[in-house]
């Protein structure tokens, strides 16, 4: 009987410690980029991306996006996802109609990162690229992100929603780093 109990405890310990240890061997930081082509001119794409308050109107992952009144001189937005998790975003750089950089400014999240949106004119349309410079602090979340979610998932969903907002079917292309 004691062997069974010890065996069961060992199994539970392995199930808890195994993912943690595996996650410790994965890098904390990652850099990923994805791009899409749109038939829209850069000014139109810029207007949509720069309107952080309008994201819930076209990206279903974002349920609300409001300016943070306590941002002081900095432009900070609080975006909430479908589960109600708040993500405070600082606008780091804004160069119309080509470059927007936002950074997660929360201290108690299991992740952090910077999104760089680049809009390039290509013919009469635009190439839109989102680069994520991310960091996942919790080793178990690192393992889950690597095995089940993928680091491109959120930027790909954003780009697909952007294309859909303009009535275009797009498939994000992963850009090698």
Language-model regions, residue ranges each:
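Hydrophobic ligand-binding cavity/cleft-lining segments
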Residues: 7-70
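Hydrophobic/aromatic beta-strand elements that line small-molecule binding cavities or substrate pockets
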Residues: 34, 87-93, 113-121
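Hydrophobic pocket/interface hotspot
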Residues: 44-49, 55, 77, 91, ...
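Sec-exported extracytoplasmic/periplasmic mature domains
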Residues: 50, 54-57, 96, 160-167, ...
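Short beta-edge strand/loop motif at the mouth of beta-sheet-based domains
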Residues: 53-88, 94-99
